[in-house]
Amino acid sequence: MHLSYSTSTYKERVYKSYSIAESYRDGKTSRKRTIWTLGKLTDQQADQIRLILKVVQNEDEVVTRLKDIVVQDTKAYLDIAVANDLWEQWQLDHAFEYDVTDSPLPTHTVAKILTINRCTDPCSHYSVPMWAKKTGLKDVLKIDLSRLNDDKIYYELDKINLNKISIENHLFNSTYKKEPGSYDFINYDLTTSYFVGFKCNLSAFGKGKKECHGRRQVLLGVLINDQGYPFKWDVFPGNTAEVKTLKGNINACKSRFKLGNKNVTVVFDRGIISDDNAELIEEAEMKYISALDRNQISPSGVNLDPFKGLSVDEVTKEVSIPAGFRKYDDELYFHDSGVIGTKRFIVGFNPTLFKEDRTNRDEKVKVFETYLKKENKDLNKAQRDRKFDATKSRIINELKRLKIRKYYESPVLNPITVVRKLKDATVRDIKSFKIEIKMKKDVVKADKLLDGVCVFISNHTEKQGRGFRVRPHTIINAYRDKTKIEDVFKNVKSFLKLRPFFVNTNAHVEAVYTICILAYFINKYLSNQRKAIGEKDYLNSKELYAPFKDIDIATLADSNTGQTVRKAVELPPDTKKLLERIELGHVALTQL
């Protein structure tokens, strides 16, 4: 049925006469018959009747009032849709090639769900099914999630770990194909994470940072390209020496990723460089850039004479720049020391760090001297016998706390007798000590020579004309650009909530790290996309997904009839514009 009308003219005015009619077929001819004649109607009345007819003919439509509409629930969806679309753009389903579960929830789908959760609202694997029910995940993925439970997740974690190498290969091939030049420099680094519990064989007590002390740990390694995208990662026992973790990665770069003999440079932090690792990289026909630890500088053979006699001017508080050093920026001056043996060394000098090193050392020495005076004063007034070992340990521990143990010889405890008069007027002899400790002035002098000094090391030794083919600026910049790999660990720990681990088997620990790397990969790509349109780097910020939060699917109900309808919240103009600019305008749901 529909609202029909006919027109007539009277005294040059046009009048409409309305009726309710319906169409029917007479053989092959379409005809119309009038059911009710209504006559003259206002425009508002005509619109109301059209609405009534529309409702009558459609079971999913109802006439109601705004005040009778209630919101039954809302479920977040847009941030999930963004992460899901980025997963699809990189075709990450194809990264799973080995022993994939053949079910409505295959291995790659579970991995996708876990990755999206890490990107948008990280929680434990036990809580993921509850998170899925509370969000619009089902609408975004368009799949049945009724079989998603913690048993299913733990089952698939084993299979996710079995696919680690194929995932690494997929990320490498995808990023290398897109930008081969992004592998001219690759970065390698490690960090630690800790456990709740003691059951995992991979975990061990190690040298992690403060938050890891007293907890079993694992060592996490990652290789990233020059754009910050990860392509290989590992989990090592927590007590593994960093210097021993590089071999497998270099072998993979040479054999699996075929990066040998392609002018690829591995950049890694001080502490990882060793003669064996340097030889390993050269055998793979690759280059490396690193820096020396403070205790490696003097034995390296670089000339430290330019730093002799340097001091902070008492009037200007400035430091003279050593002769022959060129400016890199306000915080670094450098001198290319050339090749010593088979390695190239570039000596750096930071005047700000020089002043800090000098000030910190002087302050620590003064603090210890004050402590020693007080300790001797207390020993001279001892009320009870003092023990030799306990007294000596207390002095050494204070030196260790101040990190100046190397500046002093072992403390000498000279026995003394303290005469103590008791309340009954008798006298008692108390055994105590006077502490003497000598400063190693030669050690302090040698250490002062390294204040503000850093040394970059590389095997970029090829000559070009009168200089080197690779300029010192390039080597320094590559090393100082390590912040991109520090971003990986900051994102994985602080935003993807990697730590602490709540799983126990080796395979599950490695799979959780793999999921976090996949989530970081997606976050890094989204961050780069937003940077490409002129926005800030939101990688390690809650602002990365903020424009897509609170864009929900709402279930609306008519309180009179009980009928419900599900609608996606209308996009704010700024969010809609952002999605269009990063080519994600299609992810917003229009129909459910």
What are these regions (language model features)?
Residues 2-5, 15-17, 27-28, 33, ...:
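Anion-binding and metal-coordination hotspots
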Residues 1-109:
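Conserved glycine(s) in the ABC-transporter nucleotide-binding domain "signature"
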